[in-house]
Amino acid sequence: MDNGARPLRDAKFFLVVRFWIAPGGEPQVFRWLEGGHIAEVLRQPGFLWVRRLKGTEPDATGWSAHAMIYGIESRESYDRYMANSALHARFKKERQPLEAKMRIERFAGEVDYAL
């Protein structure tokens, strides 16, 4: 996994995975993420780095807020990743035991370095 040595500016595209974890669910969710899921995503062509964030406040239901930000070489690399139906089917199956403990939403786009 990237240890932060790659410059953030290498990324021209990004994927943000926002997720909320039920109280008591963090150990199981983090075991899944750190046990291979993050590394598998970073092995995809064009994926450069990842950063994990933890929100300071839980949501209204008490679930903790988190996000993963993936830096990606290009829109084409992102599109290839999203088109990999076998990979996403496997990820979905791996997440099934976590469904009651985790809510996920995603968004992606171009990095604006003009700001």
Question: Predicted segments — roles?
Answer:
Residues 25-52, 90-91:
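Short amphipathic alpha-helical segments
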Residues 12-20:
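Active-site-flanking beta-strand signature of metal-NTP-handling nucleotidyl enzymes
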Residues 53, 105-112:
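Flexible, low-complexity linkers/stalks enriched in Thr/Pro that connect modular domains
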Residues 44-48, 61-63, 71-108:
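An amphipathic, aromatic/His-enriched active-site/gating alpha helix that lines ligand/cofactor pockets
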Residues 7-13, 60-62:
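Short, flexible turn/loop "capping" segments at secondary-structure junctions
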Residues 2-7, 54-58:
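Short beta-strand/turn micro-motifs at beta-sheet edges
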Residues 18, 112-114:
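Extracellular/lumen-exposed scaffold segments
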